[in-house]
Structure formats: C-alpha cells, structure tokens
Curated annotation (Swiss-Prot):
Entry-annotated residues carrying Phosphoserine: S139
Gene Ontology molecular-function annotations: copper ion binding; triose-phosphate isomerase activity
Positions of the catalytic residues: H96, E166
Gene name per UniProt: CTIMC
Lineage of origin: Eukaryota, Viridiplantae, Streptophyta, Embryophyta, Tracheophyta
Subunit structure: Homodimer.
Residues with PTM Phosphothreonine: T131
Pathway the protein contributes to: Carbohydrate biosynthesis; gluconeogenesis; Carbohydrate degradation; glycolysis; D-glyceraldehyde 3-phosphate from glycerone phosphate: step 1/1
Xref: Pfam families: TIM (PF00121)
SUPFAM superfamilies (alphabetical): Triosephosphate isomerase (TIM)
Protein name: Triosephosphate isomerase, cytosolic
Amino acid sequence: MARKFFVGGNWKCNGTAEEVKKIVNTLNEAQVPSQDVVEVVVSPPYVFLPLVKSTLRSDFFVAAQNCWVKKGGAFTGEVSAEMLVNLDIPWVILGHSERRAILNESSEFVGDKVAYALAQGLKVIACVGETLEEREAGSTMDVVAAQTKAIADRVTNWSNVVIAYEPVWAIGTGKVASPAQAQEVHDELRKWLAKNVSADVAATTRIIYGGSVNGGNCKELGGQADVDGFLVGGASLKPEFIDIIKAAEVKKSA
C-alpha cells in the first residue's frame, strides 16, 4: 500500500489574529493536489486553533503543537488531549526538538505523551532527530533509534502515528540534510521499525522530514523513496508552503 504524502506546517510561536487570517486565506485560495495525493495539516499556536479550525478549507486539517501527558487537572498552563478532542482538533505534534532542548522533555516523557494522546483519539506527529554534535560523533541512528524506541515501548497501534525526522542542526538554520542524508536516516529508521516493531508498521508508517524545507529543495527531498512528506517550519508561514504541498506530485509521477 502506497503511503500518502503528508505535509505539516508548524507555525510555532508566531502570528497575530490578522496574520493568521491572511495565511488561512492564502491556503484557502491555493490550487494543490487532491486529498488522495497529499494530506495537509497546519499547526497554529493554541490561541488560534478555533480561528483556524473554523475558517480553514475542509480538505486541510489542524494540529496542536503540544499537549499534556495525562488527563487535565491542576496543571497550570497545560492543555490536555481531551481538550483538543473536545475542540475537534484531530492532530498534535509531540516531541519537537525545541521542546526536548528548551523544556527538557525526555524521550520517555515524549513516549508517554504519544501513548496518552493516541489513547484519547488524537493522531500524532512524533518528532525525532539528532544534534550536530551527535551527527559528527557518528551516533545519528543510535539517537534516533532510542527516541523511537521510547515511543515503540508504549505504543501498539501505529496507524495514527507519523514520524517526523528533524535533524536539530537543520532546523531554522538554513542548513538542510542533503536528499541522500535524509533518505539514509529514513531508510535506517524504517529498517529499525521492521526489526523492532513489525514489517507492516515499517511499510505503512509515514516518515516525514523536517529541517529548513523550502520551495527550492522540497521536490528533490520528496523524491526520495523513504521520505513521505515534510514537517515545515518557517516556510509554512509563507506562500511557498503551497509549492511544498505541490511537491507531493513527485510521488505520483515516480
């Protein structure tokens, strides 16, 4: 079964209500491949989720950028998976490298979050990736495998999981993993899933690439056999996000 191309736009901590409306209008007017070719998910900051959800075109979906690890309660400042479900938000991004690095989220904590979110009915974009120091030390796959294992130890059904490989050294830096570098890690990650989870999960789970993806490099990256789409940061706030969505066509013609 072919894996449907997936393009996620992570708006991070950006935007005003007016800016968000402009971005949504641009997306709503865009001519992009149909839903059977590409799945598009955008992830605005929490405060704009209802606005985006109510105004975004029906063939695009909305994701939160994070959620709490368990049921809500006395956790000031947190948002629970149940609240997202209540708002009819279908997706959530978990384990983003910025949260791992700045907020000290461990792989085990991320794994717990993924398992809890899935149990509440959310779909999860689970992020993994290595730092520049780890890559230069030759430990890329050790790091990525350990991060993935923390999820695999807690998750049995992978049908609602998309893995986002995001080399930390390429996020917001303008540095991009070459198509060959991205393909190598995606291929190794798929082999890890086959060996440690199941051949079926390895064959069907989408592994997307994140790290300075833009309109200029998306087609070559997307053309790699094991790159099933993108998690886009800065470029998702710009019109070139539409070009990145259109890169899904490379799979159709492959």
